[in-house]
Structures are given as structure tokens and as C-alpha cells.
Amino acid sequence: MSVLITGSVAYDTIFSHEGEFARQLSGDLRNLNTTFLASSMRRDFDGCAANIALAMKRLGGDPVIWGALGMDGEDYLARFRSFGISTEGLQCFPDVYTAQCVIFTDSLGSQLAVFHPGAMNRSREVPWPRREGKDLRPKLAILSPGGKTTTLNAANECVSRGIPYLFDVGQELNLFSAEELESLLSRSFGIAYSDFEAEGFEAKTGLSSEAIGRTGKLVLRTHGSRGASLFLPGAGGAVPVEPLPVAAQNPVGAGDAMRGGFLYGLARGLDPVASARIGAIVAARKVASPSAQDYPLTLDGVRKDYEGMWGAAGF
């Protein structure tokens, strides 16, 4: 069964500076005019929707991204096709660039970043995905971070089509009013967020993870290296999801990997706990790799990890 994924599809350009930014940024910064020498540069494929889709696909799922690319989007389309990921929900706009993030780091790990949403702001213009001449009917959807308008539009479409969706709060919490957050939550089957995002959500809406669970919604709350917790409808408390022990290299993209594994399990008809455990394994495999997308992952490998942690896998 297919899973609809909305959110960002982006390119990252990462520069490294061998010195320290602070040495060139001292003094009056109101008239800043300086240049940093980059000793290395690389370009990565990134974006929440893309990361989630690739994690799902490697496990054998059927992700369908609904979103926008720009005039430079052909490389991303080719990448999706190379993995067998459907591109029927993607459209390239010739007058804008694909969403881009330019990141500059120094020897101390300090970071300067610029994000340009580009084509992401045109996502609302992309028609609903079609397959074999008919509107796609996914089993479920996830609304991952991709801009306020994109998220609100996707929620309306999913509700009107009777498609249950998971609200993935992400780092766009401050884009929404309390009323908008409550509306997005009330129409979803559940919410996914990190500890930091959960605290921000509660501060804006007054709704804790426990309170949301008591309303009948599923809550997936991630704790970084400490794993995750599930708050299930009708349950008395949180169900812990232990992390798989790995040597961490780069945590960037781990949350997306977690969601990809979680959605794969739900789409397969597994219960939320088993699905979250799959997500935890996928997240661990991502953390053990320097890349947000290019990390070793197979369903057989996930099954072995699952059995080693929790016993019979059942998938």
C-alpha cells in the first residue's frame, strides 16, 4: 500500500572552513563584509520528504512524494527513479530553483546556514498524484515540514479524500498559530515530534504528549540518542522504544529515517510499537552513517536487528 509524503525535497551544499569564524567576525558586525575560504565542498540530496521516502523504499515500501522541484530538479528525479520511487506526485517548475540549503562550518563546529525554499513555495500548484489514470488512493499520509501553506493544503486534501495522516511537526512549529496546530492535530490520526518540538507544541497549545494520547491520538516522541516513546490511545502511559546501540557519526536526518521506518510498518499493517521499533533501527543505521540518505539499509538487516533486540519480528 502506498504512503503519501508531503514536505521538503532539497539540495544541501556544505562548505568547510579550516579556521574559526569568530576570528573574522569580531568587532562591529553592522557593516559586515568578509569572505571565508572553504577547504572542501560537497553537495548532498536532502529534504524531509525525500529522506522519509528513501528510508521507506529501501525496506520495500511504496512512498509517493507530493511536492515541487525547480529548474535544477532533474538530478533529484533521476535519483528517485534509480531507487524505484514514484515521481508521479512531483512537478518541476522552470522559473525557480529547487529548495536549497547552503551550510558553512568551521573547525570548531560552528555553523552558518542559508535556506532558500524556492520551488517548495509552489507545492500547492502541484496536482494530486495519479496512478494508472486514477487519483492516487494511499493507505495513509505524513505531513512533514515543507512550509505552512503546503502543510495546511495537504491536510485539507487528505481530510477531503478520507486519507488518515500523521502530523510531523518538525522545525516549523513557529509558523503556525495555536489554533492552526490544534486543527492539524485534531484532524490527524497522530503526531510525531522530538522532545524540543513537543515542548514548543505544549507551550503554544497547552497539550502535552500524555494529554494528546488521552484524546485518542497516537503520539511518537523521539528522544535523540535515548530512543523514543509512544503514547497510544487508551494506554495509561508511554511505551518506551529502545535505541539500537551504534557508533554515531551524524544524527542529521535520523528523525526522517525514524519516520520512514515507522510508516513502513504502519502501511504493512503492523502495530504502532512494532512499527516504531523498525523506525528506531532505521534511525540507528542512519546515525551510523555521515549521509542523510546514503546509508546501508535492507529489510533483512532490519529484521535481524529487530530479532536481536526484541525477539520474533513478525514481518
Regions found by a protein language model. Name each.
Residues 1-64, 75, 247-248, 315:
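Glycine-rich phosphate/adenosyl-contacting loop at the front of the ribokinase-like
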Residues 3, 62-63, 87, 165, ...:
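Hydrophobic anchor at the start of a short beta-strand
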Residues 9, 146, 257:
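Active-site metal-binding loops of divalent metal-dependent hydrolases
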Residues 57, 159, 267:
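Gly/Ala-rich phosphate-binding loop of Rossmann-like dinucleotide-binding domains
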Residues 62-89:
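A glycine-rich beta-to-alpha transition motif near the start of alpha/beta enzyme domains, typified by
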Residues 88-93, 101-145:
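Conserved phosphate-binding/catalytic loop of the ribokinase/pfkB sugar-kinase fold
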Residues 159-240, 247:
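Conserved phosphate/ATP/ADP-binding segment of small-molecule kinases
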Residues 205-315:
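Conserved phosphate-binding/catalytic region of the ribokinase-like
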